[in-house]
Amino acid sequence: MNALMDVISDRKNNPPAEPSYVAKLLRGGTAEIGFKIVEEAAEVVEAADEPGAAGRVHLVKETADLVFHTAVMLGFHGIMWSEVEAELARRFGISGITEKQSRGSASAND
């Protein structure tokens, strides 16, 4: 993930002259990147319903797409993957309901 985040940061700070999918997404900003995240999330859910080994492979690939596009969004906002890892580590061992309540979430029952 660190290597991917480095590439995203480089594309953001030094847009390449040659075509780059990451640079294209970054130019589109939150709207374009967000559209892809929503699209990929739906594909993850669809793949999760597919049976057997082929379904498993499809789920892995779609999840990789979702993580990739999420990483681009993070990079667009100058957030490193290590910050996400730190937040996940902070939450480890805490009930999801308790964690949501600590944020003052109105939807702590979700």
Where are these regions (language model features)?
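Flexible "arm" and connector segments at domain edges
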Residues: 1-63, 67-110
